């Protein structure tokens, strides 16, 4: 498929399904939205949750068999995608608010599940998550802000974020440098197309010599924003069409989220960003403090070339299995990195069947 023919934010990647949009608001005043793809009546509903700077688009891409279509074709007759405050479809990541993942776990997911339940009732809900969506949704489950999840799949990272050394340095010094010296409070993979000699354009040019794996400026910026000096996916796993669409599929990232990630990396687990914040007084300081009591079955996915969160999910699986044996599974994906597990050209053959097997075993 010619990437020029793929419209930004298109829903055309999911065929033969009834599509409906369901906006909702959070307790702290943000407008968010769910998209419902319904084909048949079913007892098990699947919710797809993206990561930071991507959006629901990563699950409905038309250039190859996407996850939403795969699940519908495999008998899960109702699939929902969520766009929350981390979504590239919204302006929140490029604004000046200093949101944290506590905000996401406290406000976004409870509101999303309430809206979802309003339409599906008490049917079973299985949640598939990616990147910081996996971290924050896991936080919500372990904090109890969302309940009644039949199964949870987490790609790349979850409750034990770990990064390469270079990433730790960027997490430490990047936010203050961006906010107080370079300029904007966010990083954007589209800086390569910014007006010449602007700060964003200059940053893109400065990054380029260190990322010689391709000629796509957005790919270089994404590697700089998230990779440990290497791309966030294995290039041989990505369709050239998808690679050319990176500026459409990824948006800005507010650097304050990096501060929260750094705090977790240093703590070795998911922790609250600010213990003194009265808004989050009911959230645990340590999200793993009652981990043994969480009964939700979890599948951890990770590529063996994950240059963003390295062995985070391997370590998380080992830790949670020591606390609650038998509730957690791990699948290591040969040749895959961070993003390509869900967005890769052959993910429907290499990755999705493993997720499907887990879902079917946890379904009624």
Model-inferred region functions:
Residues 6-38:
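N-terminal cap/lid segment of alpha/beta-hydrolase-fold proteins
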Residues 26, 33-91, 313:
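Short, surface-exposed "cap/lid" segments of acyl-processing enzymes
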Residues 50, 125-134, 303:
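Conserved alpha/beta-hydrolase "nucleophile elbow" surrounding the catalytic nucleophile
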Residues 98-119:
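Alpha/beta-hydrolase active-site loop
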Residues 118-122, 132-272:
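Alpha/beta-hydrolase-fold enzymes
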Residues 294, 300-302:
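Short beta-strand/loop motif that positions the catalytic acidic residue
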Residues 307-314:
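Conserved alpha/beta-hydrolase "acid-adjacent" motif
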Residues 327-364:
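Catalytic active-site module of serine/aspartate enzymes centered on a nucleophile-bearing elbow/loop
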């Amino acid at each position: 498929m010619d990437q020029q023919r793929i419209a930004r934010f298109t829903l055309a990647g999911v065929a033969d399904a009834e599509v409906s949009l369901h906006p909702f608001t959070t307790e702290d005043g943000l407008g968010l939205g769910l998209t419902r793809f319904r084909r048949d009546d079913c007892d098990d509903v699947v919710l797809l949750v993206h990561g930071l700077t991507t959006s629901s688009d990563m699950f409905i891409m038309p250039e190859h068999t996407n996850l939403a279509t795969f699940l519908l074709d495999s008998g899960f007759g109702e699939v929902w995608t969520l766009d929350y405050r981390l979504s590239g479809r919204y302006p929140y990541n490029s604004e000046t608010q200093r949101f944290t993942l506590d905000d996401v776990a406290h406000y976004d997911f409870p509101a999303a599940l309430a809206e979802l339940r309003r339409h599906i009732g008490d049917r079973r809900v299985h949640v598939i998550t990616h990147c910081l969506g996996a971290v924050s949704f896991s936080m919500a489950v372990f904090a109890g802000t969302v309940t009644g999840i039949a199964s949870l799949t987490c790609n790349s990272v979850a409750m034990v974020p770990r990064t390469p050394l270079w990433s730790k340095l960027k997490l430490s010094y990047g936010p203050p440098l961006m906010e107080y010296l370079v300029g904007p409070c966010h990083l954007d993979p589209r800086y390569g197309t910014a007006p010449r000699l602007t700060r964003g354009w200059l940053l893109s040019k400065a990054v380029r010599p260190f990322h010689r794996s391709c000629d796509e400026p957005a790919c270089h910026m994404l590697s700089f924003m998230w990779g440990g000096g290497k791309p966030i996916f294995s290039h041989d796993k990505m369709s050239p069409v998808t690679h050319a669409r990176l500026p459409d599929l990824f948006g800005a990232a507010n650097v304050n989220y990096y501060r929260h990630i750094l705090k977790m990396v240093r703590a070795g687990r998911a922790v609250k960003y600010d213990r003194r914040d009265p808004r989050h007084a009911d959230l645990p300081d340590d999200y793993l403090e009652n981990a043994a009591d969480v009964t939700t079955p979890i599948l951890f996915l990770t590529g063996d070339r994950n240059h963003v969160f390295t062995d985070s999910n391997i370590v998380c699986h080992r830790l949670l299995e020591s606390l609650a044996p038998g509730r957690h599974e791990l699948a290591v994906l040969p040749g895959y990195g961070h993003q390509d597990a869900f967005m890769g050209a052959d993910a429907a053959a290499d990755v999705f069947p493993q997720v499907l097997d887990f879902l079917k075993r946890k379904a009624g």
